[in-house]
């Protein structure tokens, strides 16, 4: 059966751990696995702008022996009303995997329903699961075992990073706290799914409007832009309510003395995170960005070699 990676809880705890272990191996030996040798092709489609996702998938696919066919959605029939089901059937005859960065999650679900090759969510409005694999790899590098750690996220609790962190981190046994302003809490269905997964792994999920409480004793502090792509004109005030959730030196000082800070990038320096923290000793942001390459390669190997 073809496996897809559309949201973080598509992986069981054991499957996630296997991928993270493989990511660590591939970081040490980048050319040790070549499931795409030939080269075999991977469709990499972008409906949204990208820097890290584009470079990391393109380079990673090459390191796996393959060829990335990178296009923007508007340059294909995806932008001219061809059904996603028809596109999935056609692409499945050309390539060995489909990597897609798009808008609504329902588009990925529709593509995966018909595709006979793996479909990978490279970011949607609702989830960013490839980023969270890289985040977990980075945390494991700095902290060792993930199980039992405390991760606190600060910012828009309804955005794709908050959703994926809840699902992905609790899968690894990490306790997650989402600190967010009133009116920006996570989607109830995602929160329920995260709590259900947490029950199975011994983790927990908490949502709070108190940033200081969330930071106290945390092992990992994570933030993201206050305005995600496509939200620029949604009519909501995405500045004033978020100032108490800025990741700054004072907030970091409330966390564990060996805490690390993550940000998926791009960052709006001086808004959700200060220069002092981003460039300071607690920052693991640059390792996190690099690990997109290794984590995504591991995911592709896992999907393709099944």
Swiss-Prot record:
SUPFAM superfamilies: Aspartate/ornithine carbamoyltransferase (SSF53671). Its EC number is 2.1.3.3. InterPro entries: Asp/Orn_carbamoyltranf_P-bd (IPR006132), Asp/Orn_carbamoylTrfase (IPR006130), Asp/Orn_carbamoylTrfase_sf (IPR036901), Asp_carbamoyltransf_Asp/Orn-bd (IPR006131), Orn/put_carbamltrans (IPR002292), OTCase_ArgI (IPR024904). Keywords: Amino-acid biosynthesis, Arginine biosynthesis, Cytoplasm, Transferase. L-ornithine binds at residues 160, 224, 228-229. GO terms for molecular function: amino acid binding; ornithine carbamoyltransferase activity. It catalyses: carbamoyl phosphate + L-ornithine = L-citrulline + phosphate + H(+). One of its GO terms (cellular component) is cytoplasm. GO terms for biological process: arginine biosynthetic process via ornithine; citrulline biosynthetic process; L-arginine biosynthetic process. Carbamoyl phosphate binds at residues 50-53, 77, 101, 128-131, 264-265, 292. NCBIfam families: orni_carb_tr (TIGR00658), PRK00779.1 (NF001986). Belongs to the aspartate/ornithine carbamoyltransferase superfamily. OTCase family. HAMAP family: OTCase. This is Ornithine carbamoyltransferase. It comes from Mycobacterium leprae (strain TN). The gene is argF.
């Amino acid at each position: 059966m073809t496996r897809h990676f559309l949201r973080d809880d598509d992986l069981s705890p054991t499957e996630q751990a296997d991928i993270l272990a493989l990511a660590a191996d591939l970081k040490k030996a980048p050319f040790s696995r070549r499931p795409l040798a030939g080269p075999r092709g991977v469709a990499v489609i972008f409906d949204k702008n990208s820097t890290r996702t584009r470079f990391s998938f393109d380079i990673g696919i090459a390191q796996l022996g393959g060829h990335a066919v990178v296009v923007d959605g508007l340059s294909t029939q995806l932008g001219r009303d061809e059904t996603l089901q028809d596109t999935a059937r056609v692409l499945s005859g050309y390539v060995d995997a489909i990597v897609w960065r798009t808008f609504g999650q329902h588009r990925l679900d529709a593509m995966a329903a018909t595709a006979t090759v793996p479909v990978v969510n490279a970011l949607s409005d609702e989830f960013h699961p490839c980023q969270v694999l890289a985040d977990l790899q980075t945390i494991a590098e700095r902290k060792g075992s993930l199980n039992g750690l405390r991760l606190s996220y600060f910012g828009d609790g309804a955005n794709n990073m908050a959703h994926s962190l809840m699902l992905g981190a609790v899968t690894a046994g990490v306790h997650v706290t989402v600190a967010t302003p009133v009116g920006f809490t996570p989607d109830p269905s995602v929160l329920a799914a995260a709590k259900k997964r947490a029950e199975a792994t011994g983790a927990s999920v908490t949502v709070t409007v108190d940033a200081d409480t969330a930071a106290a004793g945390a092992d990992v502090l994570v933030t993201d832009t206050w305005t995600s792509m496509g939200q620029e004109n949604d009519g909501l005030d995405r500045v004033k309510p978020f100032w108490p959730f800025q990741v700054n030196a004072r907030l970091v000082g409330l966390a564990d003395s060996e805490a690390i800070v993550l940000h998926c990038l791009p960052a709006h320096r001086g808004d959700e995170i200060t220069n002092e923290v981003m460039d300071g000793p607690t920052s693991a942001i640059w390792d996190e960005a690099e690990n997109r390459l290794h984590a995504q390669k591991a995911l592709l190997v896992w999907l393709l070699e099944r």
